[in-house]
Every structure is written in structure tokens, then in C-alpha cells.
């Protein structure tokens, strides 16, 4: 089973590291091409393109400028420990054992606008480049055209390496759009998380994102290898709703806390 999750905008390069092991991203040549394009942007252009404040635009212009491809533990950190967002609050990778990191390295992938695909222990330097951003490049008008089949091919390599054909899609639509399902040598299972509000179950963004991290952790901690095992997920009050589920979609619900 291969789990896909999105990256996060919030990055942590300060906290103590819980593992010293690392690998290098497999698509750094592509990342370098995107950095070359991004360096052409002025801070005001970055602000407009990413819809961020002038201050954040300045920070990210500096990140593009400072980025260099010789990654070391001194100038980069493991991706799974850098990202800090709702998904990663649920994942809590900072509490992983070395065995957890081993399993995650084989079975978890983070999709990325800049790096394409990241394994948990891949070093990364700080960046902000969301997949949906329309950054013109030599291959087209946006990052989806830039990455083309590259991300899908890399995922197929990972599936072949583990001798499996199931992808658990816990990524956002923006990021999963970078994957070509028809070219993916896998059955795609999408867990959906619904929270009750005023008597109705619906997707509440913050809770759903955190639940994607909780589900990723559940798979990693329990070393799950078959999609039917996912129905046992019960973290923080969620339960599997078979009646609402289908072959490609597993629905989990949680009652409102009263």
C-alpha cells in the first residue's frame, strides 16, 4: 500500500530532530528547473501569484534565492519532520520509532509542487510553491504541465518496489490532480472523513485534514498492507460507515461532541 498526502505551508526547521537518518529527493533535477523559473519572480509578483502578504513574499523570494541543490543535514531537513500543518498534527511523525520511519519510508509519499514526490526521510530546503500555482515554465503554463507523467511514474516505481497495487489517496484534490489515475498501476482508495454538525455529517476542512494524518499514522503504526484493514480506523472518535462507502471510497464519520 502506498499512502499519498499533501505537504504543508508551515515549516519547522528549529525543533530537535527525532532521527538522524536521511535520504535525498529523487527529482532534484526537476526542482532545480523550477527554482530557476521562480527566481525570475519579484516579491510583488510572488505576492500576486501566491496570494500572500508582502512580508511572506519577501521570505519566499529569499528562499528561492538561497536554495541550492547540494542538500546536507546542515542546510536541509527530513520532509516528514519539516511540514507542520493540520495533516501533520494528526501524523505526529516526531514521535515515530525508527521502525515507524522504516515503514513510512516505504509506504508514505508526500506530493510537492517543487519536489514532485518526497519520501519521509528525504531532505528538503524550505520553499513555498503550491501545486495549483500557475507558474509558467518550459513545459507549460502551470505545475501540472511541468510535472506531466513524472510524479505518476515515480509512484509506479514505488509500487513496483513493494510489489503492491493499492494507493491510499489522503492528499487534497489540488495535489492529487498531479497524479494520472489511468496511468497509475494501482487501485485507488480514498478515505473520506465526515464530522457531525447540527445533526448533519459533512466535511469540515480542519478536522478532515487532521484525520488524514491520523489515518496515515494508523496505517504506519499498525503496519497495514491491505485496504480492508483501514475499516478498523477509530482514532479520536471516528468510525467506519459501511453503508455510505463504496469500492473506491471509505467513509468515516464522527459524532458531534455534546
Swiss-Prot record:
It comes from Escherichia coli O1:K1 / APEC. GO terms for cellular component: cytosol. PANTHER family: PEROXIDE STRESS RESISTANCE PROTEIN YAAA, PEROXIDE STRESS RESPONSE PROTEIN YAAA. This is UPF0246 protein YaaA. Belongs to the UPF0246 family. HAMAP family: UPF0246 (MF_00652). It holds the Pfam family H2O2_YaaD. One of its GO terms (biological process) is response to hydroperoxide. InterPro entries: YaaA.
